[in-house]
Amino acid sequence: MHELVLSGRFVLNGEIVGGSIGIDNGLITEISRRDIKGEEVIAFKSEIILPGLIDTHVHLRDFEQKEKETVESGTKAALHGGITAVFDMPNTKPPIMDVKTFEKRLSILEKHAYSDYAASFLLAGNCGEASRARADFYKIFMGASTGGIFSENFESDYSCAPGIVSVHAEDPETIRENPERPPEAEIRAIKKALTAAEKLRKPLNVCHVSTVGGIEAIIKKNLPWVSFEVTPHHLFLTSKDFERNPLLKVYPPLRSEEHRKALWENFSRIPIIASDHAPHTIEDKEAGAAGIPGLETEVALLLDAANRGLITVFDIVEKMHDNPVRFFGIKGRDFSLGNEATFTIIDPKKEWKVKPEEFYTKAKWSPWEGKKLKGKVVMTVIRGMVVMEGDEIIEEPKGVRLDVQGGNH
């Protein structure tokens, strides 16, 4: 008899099957298409059990920006949105660019994270410090973004990174000439990054690709050690939305319908969907800060798209679990015997309205405020613990650091 059994429908080998998952000591100990016995059984009917979804691009702020977000509020938001692990970004205040700051960040994450996490390090001419930090991944900004620090020599910083690099690709010269950050800023930077990647053959993850030229350049090169992310806001919003609502300022900016359409036309080729959750106070947003909160809406937006026939549940699993696990080499997260019992449970037909005042993030606004969505996260389970149920966080902060090995390329 298992300690816990989840019974109902779940995604297994590319299909939705009925059955049961046995869990003991936080690990998956049985996967069966029949009913199995447990000391506690949670039986689902209309819901579907997904492997625990992962967001590879999250700004948890904290440090000197606790008014914007903290590790606690951000990782609670993650669980609420069905995200079981977040990749914490390093352009904090102060930035995570030396071993002392990195270790301070680890201490905060260890004490206050409700979700699991990967810890990052910001690279900008500080290779010596990077080699001592032992981060899970390394971030390079090719052009200035929130925080203002960017790499003066991308190839040098990328070359010295001790692990996988995630890159914010916008060309600084183009931005200086045109602060509105036209598509060419992204396309030039992506092509430069790809040239370095082809030469160095080191794993590279290109963040928030938003343009026709950007996505086409990556697909054309087809380098096995290069992955890329697309955000829900670039999939679902355009520059016309920004014209109506200045709070939608984000880097890279929302694009024209032509670019949004290209992302959808290439949707099957997109490896990773990530939120780029970037919370600010409403005062900072009104003063021009760039960034959109997304942890508590990204999965629901994709479920709503699935209900409209644009994508499938399998796409969500592929782009928010399978590919992040494979590319970053996250150990213990595959849905198989002996691995962690970590799940995102969705009700694919549940209708609800986006109410930012009920969010756990400190950013109490959303581009989708008041929007009715079909499909909702109803429970989040980490290592056999129900940590979120029915919009309520019901566990203490028990998040742990992911075991990121660097991936298979």
From Swiss-Prot:
Family: Belongs to the metallo-dependent hydrolases superfamily. DHOase family. Class I DHOase subfamily.
UniProt binding sites for Zn(2+) 1: H57, H59, K139, D276
Coiled coil: none
Binding sites annotated in the UniProt record for Zn(2+) 2: K139, H168, H208
Organism lineage string: Archaea, Methanobacteriati, Methanobacteriota, Thermococci, Thermococcales
Cofactor: how bound: Binds 2 Zn(2+) ions per subunit.
Active site as annotated: D276
Keywords from the named record: Hydrolase, Metal-binding, Pyrimidine biosynthesis, Zinc
Alphabetical list of PANTHER family matching this protein: ALLANTOINASE (PTHR43668:SF2)
Pfam families recorded: Amidohydro_1
Gene this protein is translated from: pyrC
Biological source species: Thermococcus kodakarensis (strain ATCC BAA-918 / JCM 12380 / KOD1)
Cofactor: Zn(2+)
Molecular function terms from GO: allantoinase activity; dihydroorotase activity; zinc ion binding
GO terms for biological process, alphabetical: 'de novo' UMP biosynthetic process; purine nucleobase catabolic process
Protein name, entry field: Dihydroorotase
Catalytic activity line of the entry: (S)-dihydroorotate + H2O = N-carbamoyl-L-aspartate + H(+)
Pathway: Pyrimidine metabolism; UMP biosynthesis via de novo pathway; (S)-dihydroorotate from bicarbonate: step 3/3
